[in-house]
Amino acid sequence: MSKLNYKVETDPNKTARAMGRSLRISRKHTIEICREISGMKLDKAIAYLNRVIELKQVVPFKRHGKDVPHKKGKYGWTAGRFPQKASTQILSVLENAKKNAEYKGMNTEKLRIKHISSNKGFTIKRHMPRAFGRASPKNQETVHVQVILEEFY
């Protein structure tokens, strides 16, 4: 695999980073979750994702919400979903970044998400046998997620 660089250059003494590579989750769901939790305090973002996993909090789909139905509750947008699989994977990346910050000696109660983004990963190419000796592609898209945390005062 090639080396992936972070999109944002930061001071390594003041920030903690983590990256999830080749995650088998939906890129559209990941984009919507990253947009929603960007800039949040870390504890608040972890609680938000836990509520999404428990089907108590809706993630508004602002970019990829053309045919997405309304959900009950106040969340500030008309279209929304509960992307549980993507929330679980992003939650594990956030907790990894939190542990990296703790290892660096940063105060984990005063961390906020400075940068979070999702990029297209590689495609796992497979095929499905069909009738008369043919085969149809059955590809699996993957996603890379980057998180940078910083202390706020």
Swiss-Prot record:
GO terms for cellular component: cytosolic large ribosomal subunit. The lineage of its organism: Archaea, Methanobacteriati, Methanobacteriota, Methanomada group, Methanococci. GO terms for molecular function: rRNA binding; structural constituent of ribosome. Part of the 50S ribosomal subunit. This protein binds specifically to 23S rRNA. It makes multiple contacts with different domains of the 23S rRNA in the assembled 50S subunit and ribosome. Belongs to the universal ribosomal protein uL22 family. GO terms for biological process: cytoplasmic translation. The keyword Cell cycle does not apply. The gene is rpl22. This is Large ribosomal subunit protein uL22. Keywords: Ribonucleoprotein, Ribosomal protein, RNA-binding, rRNA-binding. PANTHER family: 60S RIBOSOMAL PROTEIN L17. NCBIfam families: PRK04223.1 (NF003260), uL22_arch_euk (TIGR01038). It comes from Methanococcus aeolicus (strain ATCC BAA-1280 / DSM 17508 / OCM 812 / Nankai-3). HAMAP family: Ribosomal_uL22_A.
